[in-house]
Structures are given as C-alpha cells and as structure tokens.
C-alpha cells in the first residue's frame, strides 16, 4: 500500500525502516517464537530490550551518570502532576506559560495540595506567538518549569535559561529533534508519540538528587519507587519501549541528534521560506521563536483554510488541520518526516494558491 504524507502532531510518523523491522519481527522476536507483545517483562529477552533502550538514549542525549532514565506510562500529562508532587516539597514552583500545554501543566500543579505556583513569564498577551524573556528565579523556588516546544502554537525555546534552581522541561514535541545539554536540566519529560515511538510510553530523565524528596507518595507516582525498580514497578509498556529502542537505533544511524537537527532545520527552512515569500499563506509565529517540528500557517480566509485541508487530504497530505483551539493549518515535521514530503507540500500549496488568487473558493 502506498503511504501518504502524515503531518500528524501525534501519534506521528515513524521511520519506515523501523516499521519494516517491527513487521519482520512481529510474530517471532529474536527467534523466540513469541512476539515482543507476548514477552514477559521479567524475561531476559525484554530486559535486554530495556537495557539497550536506556543505553541508546543515554548515548544520543549524552545523559550524565547522575541522572536516572525512566520509561513510564500516563503520558506527559501525568508528569504535570508527578513533577510538583515529587519536586515542590513545600516550596514555590515557577512556571513559564508559552501555550496550551504549559497552561495545562500550570493548572495541574495548582491542584496539588501545598504547592504554590507562580507564573513568572507568559506570551499569552500576543497569542503565544513568541517566547517571553524569563526573569531570574529566586533560589528559594523548588524548580522552574518550561516547555521547550509548543506543539499547538508552533514556538520553540532553544536557549534554556541558566538557573539557580532545577529546570524542568516538557520536551514532548522536540525531544531528540534538537541538541540540548541535559546538564542544564533537573528533569526532562516527554510523551513518546511524536519523536520516540508509539503512544503509551513516557520518557523521564531526572537528576538523582531530586529523587526521594517527598515521602508518602502513591507508589506509582513516586520517582523514587520507579527509579528503584528500574521502570518495572509494574508491567511497563513493553512494545512501545521496543519500538523506541528501534527508533533510537535509527536516529544513531542518521548521525545522532546533531544529524537529525541539521535535517530538521533544512526541512523547516524550506517551508518557512515558502510561507514568508507567499502572498497567500502566512505564519502567525514570530521568526525568532519558530519551531522546527510544528509549523502552523493560515490563509486570509477560514473558508480557504477549510478548502485547503480538504483538498490536501484528497492529494495524500494527511492531518494538516490546525488544532481546534487555533484553527488554520499545521504541518508537523518530526524526525521521521521525509524532506520529500515538505517539497511535495510546498508544490501543492503553490498550486492551491494560484488556483484561488481570484478569490473563489473551490471545494
């Protein structure tokens, strides 16, 4: 079956070589006569998968030895609760509000009893079209929470602030797509379904000194319990971890995160350059804050936007509709998305624009 160009914001496109390997190994993994989905999580076969996945992500992100790598469940949304529960410890928590997902993290933190949340910077005044300047954080604050890529709004934070307190980052939509210095963070978390693998897995990278600060937490929500049990306090998402391991291997073959970032910059530049020179399409995001992985764009008409999405689908360009909260279109160009797909999209955009510059909507 011919594959389409999938611009989904998540679950998102996976590398074809990874999917092909999954297909080959689906019925019998490593000659076992069992699918990975059927392996006991306590088996040697799965333990090797888990160990390899951790070793690879440590290599790709250059994770220091004093950080734990956890493969958890519950999505990044569960980390909106686990982070303040484990790290606030009676202190104030500082948050930067750069979009819809940051707002959800802030809202969840406020629900945790005993946690005082302070929003120290926000870009909501201009519809989250930029990254705000982050003031110096007081040393009596427990942590500073940032979102490095705002999936819905299409902005990204590439320069992480130096801070006297631990920086916590939601990297769900740009982990492994740009190089970040892990040592600048106290904790990084990311849902897997954009750049890592299938939905159902959450990656958490946490500095060891931040673990175990709060006693009496529910076991499943306690980083200490999860770390002491090497991500296997309960049955982990075994198949998702297996696919993630294959994706990590694929990223390594592409030249690691630096190699992937170079390709991502090329893909994003092609699309942004076209949008900027177009008199039909435009970007709502300030150039200095533009994401490499999520590119929103609009026409000057909601009717044209609707027609574009419909015709795009008919031509093999799937999931270009913008998030329901902002409208327009959004092209998600995650690591596995091919540059040929960007070139094909631009050609389609030009054809669509030329056909409608007279002002008529043709659906």
Curated annotation (Swiss-Prot):
GO BP annotations of the record are: L-serine biosynthetic process; pyridoxine biosynthetic process
Cofactor note as given: Binds 1 pyridoxal phosphate per subunit.
Entry keywords, A to Z: Amino-acid biosynthesis, Aminotransferase, Cytoplasm, Pyridoxal phosphate, Pyridoxine biosynthesis, Serine biosynthesis, Transferase
Pfam family of the protein (one): Aminotran_5
Q: What is its main location?
A: cytoplasm
- The disulfide bridges present are none
Q: Give all N6-(pyridoxal phosphate)lysine modified positions.
A: 194
User: Which reaction equation describes what this protein catalyses?
Assistant: O-phospho-L-serine + 2-oxoglutarate = 3-phosphooxypyruvate + L-glutamate; 4-(phosphooxy)-L-threonine + 2-oxoglutarate = (R)-3-hydroxy-2-oxo-4-phosphooxybutanoate + L-glutamate
Instruction: State the PANTHER family in the record.
Output: PHOSPHOSERINE AMINOTRANSFERASE
Instruction: Give the protein's recorded name.
Output: Phosphoserine aminotransferase
Species annotation: Listeria monocytogenes serovar 1/2a (strain ATCC BAA-679 / EGD-e)
